[in-house]
Design a protein with these regions (language model features):
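Short cytosolic juxtamembrane segments of multi-pass membrane proteins
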Residues: 2-6, 180-195, 583-584, 674-684
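Hydrophobic alpha-helical transmembrane segments of multi-pass inner-membrane transport and secretion
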Residues: 20-47, 56-92, 112-122, 126, ...
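Alpha-helical transmembrane segments, especially those used as permease/efflux helices
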Residues: 21-29, 34-38, 162-167, 195-308, ...
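Small-residue-rich transmembrane alpha-helices
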Residues: 31-45, 78-82, 89, 114-144, ...
Length: 684
């Protein structure tokens, strides 16, 4: 019986005596369990399930649980590998005293069991306690009524327990792999065996610089938001690879350059720190690169999701400039004539009146649309030979009658034969002429007219809104030409948008129970669709606002949760980096003090090393963020939010707050490093 408990006691004693190493690891494990449980529970929360807009939030949170699971696996592997390296000397001593590797494996097994039990139990307990607080915060972000019913998600408990059991099993197997094949002498000398100083690797440094320059060029050169979405992940991968190459290889090259600068290198505060950094920069560079990438992820997430959440009402108003939007679709060879549109207008207004409301701020207009690939100022409609890469260049072309545009905007614009006005959305159009499929050419009189808000802003593809005179004549010519050339029949649409004095819960189908104008209009238009053979749709700002809030609120909440996880991960990496360097530099500083280096000189050397290395990730993360700004702005346009000033503000505030937190971590970890390197000298 005592033999069975021996390994458990040895495991617990080893963890307790190495608590400086294990405590951050245990806290990280518990924090991952906590975050996973909360996100998993919220994604299936009955509160979100029964609220308007909750479906969008649930989907976003499910994606967040996948991110947490993958990140937990990678991060916990990284930190546990560090723990095993630091304890190799201890395991070597066990081996010398008669324990075989099988016995050491049993100690590791018990450490894994203890770690899993402590962290999973603590994480789930805190998760159940804090879950309701997170749910209340989520509900408040979605701006819906609060409920105070306490719930425990059994499925989330089981999922978290199973996931982290699998992760800890893999970590155990990796730890056994690290010890396999290492002799007792090798384990005992593991901390004393040094690495060869890495040489400056100019090829890898140049490769990193080229990759980073390429990613930055993509960020600033892409104009269309859809193309930005397509290339965003490629640019992210390029930045990650470049960051690792520059920190691992470029930092070594930098250290070699500093060593060649005798005035800088041969100073007490620089000599030890620079030589130490160059000696182990390959390992430290990877850690610093990880911190830089995590910092960039936090800054991008917080700045973009905060901008989305703060500007969500602007996005709603851009997509739905009026309370209601009625659209009737018909083929262009059978367009609605004036008598039919007047009948529809009277029918809509009568439906609103019978429901107890009135229309105001009315905008009614016709439009016809085609799509094709731009070739300079020519939009080619026959895209049979188009490649998959051309999909991001497909442009929507909407033609509106001049008289309808004037009526909708209150302007008095005029056009002659062959002249048009153009408004470009999510693309640039710098040309003086517009040609449609090489046959219909128009002179562009103005490229910057205000576009009509509403359905046009819903397209994520590049869009050109073209105001044209003699609309009916042009539509007939276009229809005849395209039907003969491609066999196409175009779709003509009549829009009738208006505000109403009805309360929001009576405007749209928000809760599925309250009688509302949206359902009444759909009932009226169903008869029109059946009798006339046309398509119809009704959109309510009030009903769709909940979906916007659900999506933007969910993204903001997920951004906060993931940022917390990534910040703690960055802190843990920095902490372990300082511990590792502190233990490795301890004997070196002891020797330097014995040959005349004072504690003041030691402190200066530490500050020099920390200031030179510690702030590099923050500075480079700031540079990454600046070049990512055009990408972020274009991606937000896909969410109907085009507010550059707001994005600049949220980005600046996010970086300032993060920099303050980073400075605090610098102070704390710097003190830890100093205490370690000064331990031997103070004992004397």
């Amino acid at each position: 019986m005592r033999e069975k408990t021996l390994y458990a006691r040895l495991a617990w004693t080893g963890m307790r005596k190495n608590r400086r190493l294990y405590l951050p690891y245990l806290l990280s494990c518990a924090g991952m369990v906590l975050m996973f449980y909360i996100l998993m529970g919220l994604s299936g929360s009955p509160v979100l399930e029964h609220m308007s807009g909750g479906g969008s939030s649930a989907i976003i949170l499910r994606l967040g649980t996948v991110v947490i699971a993958v990140f937990a696996l990678i991060f916990l592997f990284y930190t546990h590998s560090f723990l095993i390296r630091r304890r190799e000397r201890e395991f070597g001593l066990y081996n010398v005293l008669g324990m075989g590797k099988g016995n050491i494996a049993r100690i590791l097994l018990w450490e894994t069991v203890i770690t899993y039990g402590l962290t999973t139990g603590t994480g789930l307990l805190l998760g159940m306690v804090l879950y309701k607080l997170a749910e209340l915060g989520m509900v408040r972000l979605l701006q819906v009524p609060v409920t105070y019913t306490l719930t425990v998600s059994v499925s989330s408990l089981l999922a978290a327990a199973a996931l982290f059991a699998a992760i800890h099993t893999l970590i155990l197997l990796n730890g056994l792999r690290q010890l396999h094949g290492v002799s007792a002498v090798g384990l005992l000398r593991s901390e004393s065996v040094g690495e060869k100083p890495p040489k400056a690797q100019w090829v890898l440094t140049a490769a990193g610089a080229v990759l980073l320059a390429g990613a930055y060029w993509l960020a600033v050169s892409i104009r269309e938001p859809l193309a930005a979405l397509t290339w965003f992940f490629a640019a992210v991968l390029m930045v990650i690879a470049a960051t690792y190459l520059l920190f691992i290889s470029g930092s070594v090259t930098l250290c070699r350059g500093l060593q060649r600068n005798k005035k800088y290198y041969y100073r007490p505060q620089h000599f030890v720190s620079v030589s130490s950094m160059a000696y182990r920069m390959k390992r430290n560079g990877a850690g610093l690169a990880s911190v830089c990438i995590l910092a960039t992820m936090v800054l991008v997430m917080i700045s973009s999701t905060t901008c989305l959440y703060v500007g969500q009402e602007d996005a709603v108003n851009s997509r739905y400039p009026r309370d209601m939007d009625v659209a009737v679709y018909g083929r262009s060879d059978h367009p609605l004539d004036e008598a039919e549109t007047e009948q529809l207008r009277q029918g809509v207004e009568s439906t609103v009146f019978n429901f107890g409301g009135q229309t105001s701020n009315v905008a009614t207009y016709r439009e016809i649309s085609v799509s094709g690939l731009p070739d300079g100022g020519d939009l080619r409609l026959g895209n049979a030979g188009a490649s998959a890469a051309d999909s991001t260049r497909v442009t929507q072309l909407h033609f509106l009658p001049l008289e309808d545009y004037n009526a909708a905007t209150g302007q008095s614009l005029t056009l002659g034969d062959g002249q048009v006005y153009v408004a470009a959305l999510r693309t640039d159009f710098p040309y003086d002429t517009l040609t449609v499929d090489g046959e219909w050419t128009f002179r562009v009189m103005d490229r910057d007219i205000p576009p009509l808000s509403g359905p046009f802003t819903a397209d994520i593809t590049p869009t050109l809104m073209v105001v044209i005179p003699h609309f009916t004549q042009f539509v007939q010519e276009l229809e005849d030409g395209l039907s003969e050339k491609y066999g196409w029949y175009l779709t003509a649409t009549w829009h009738y948008a208006f505000d109403t004095d009805l309360p929001e819960n009576q405007q749209g189908n928000i809760d599925g129970t309250t009688p509302n104008l949206e359902d009444a209009l759909n009932g009226y238009l169903a008869g029109v669709s059946s009798d006339w053979g046309v398509g119809v749709s009704v959109e309510s700002k009030a009903a769709n606002r909940a979906d916007f809030y659900g999506t933007y609120g969910g993204l903001f909440f997920l951004g906060i949760m993931l940022s917390i996880v990534f910040i703690f991960a960055a802190v843990a990496i920095l902490y372990y980096k300082q511990l590792s360097e502190g233990y490795e530099d301890q004997s070196r500083f002891d020797i330097m003090q014995k040959v005349g280096m004072t504690k003041v000189d030691i402190r200066r050397s530490i500050n020099s090393q920390l200031l030179t290395v510690f702030y590099l990730p923050l500075v480079l993360a700031g540079v990454h963020l600046c070049f990512a700004f055009p990408f972020i702005h274009k991606l937000l346009i896909l969410f109907n939010l085009d507010n550059r000033g707001l994005l600049i503000g949220t980005t600046a505030v996010s970086f300032a707050v993060f920099a303050v937190l980073y400075a605090i971590v610098y102070k704390l970890t710097g003190n830890t490093y100093y205490r370690i390197v000064a331990e031997d000298t103070e004992k004397e």
